[in-house]
Amino acid sequence: MKIIMLGAPGAGKGTQAKKIAAKYDIPHISTGDIFRANIKNGTELGNKAKTYMDQGLLVPDELVVDLVVDRVQQDDCKNGYVLDGFPRTVPQAEALDKALAALGDKVDYAIDVNVPDENIVNRMGGRRACVGCGATYHLVYAPTKTEGICDVCGKELILRDDDKPETVQKRLNVYHEQTQPLIDYYTKAGILKTVDGTVDINDVFAAIVEILGA
């Protein structure tokens, strides 16, 4: 089964992608991992991507699609894969579908882990990081033994700029702008499945397993 995971930053799609990969023994593929592997191995595609990245430029969609398609043709993907973080836009989705079709392949499911913005802002706003060792906590879900103090090294905990409500909301606005058309695209294709991401992690996963029918 070939699966694409959709969901806003902080919705938990990465966690679910890992759980799917483990249960069905298929690779969990992120574009970041693909970039790092190709650059490390000095592949032609990796070197092209590195040229853009070294200049602080976005890697063009065509090149990202080439990298993804190259990855999903590898032996460990013969029984399927979970794509996490790609595609992000309709042009990327169209290019991916076209490239897969040329190989006689297609995406089976696009699973949207749906969480309201307010929940995500609260989730991410509760994160704390240690100024000393970098350990991460959550005020509600993973609190420290002593409030505001790291369990590991005893240093102070801070709210990172990335987790501040106004920053999170900006990221969510960008996500919705880019991804709502993508959700519409996969709805028209008849492969979009939506799960409630506000419930317990294991309940989210159970809903996904039910969708996948195994």
Question: Model features per residue range: what roles?
Answer:
Residues 1-214:
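Glycine-rich phosphate-binding loop of ATP-dependent small-molecule kinases
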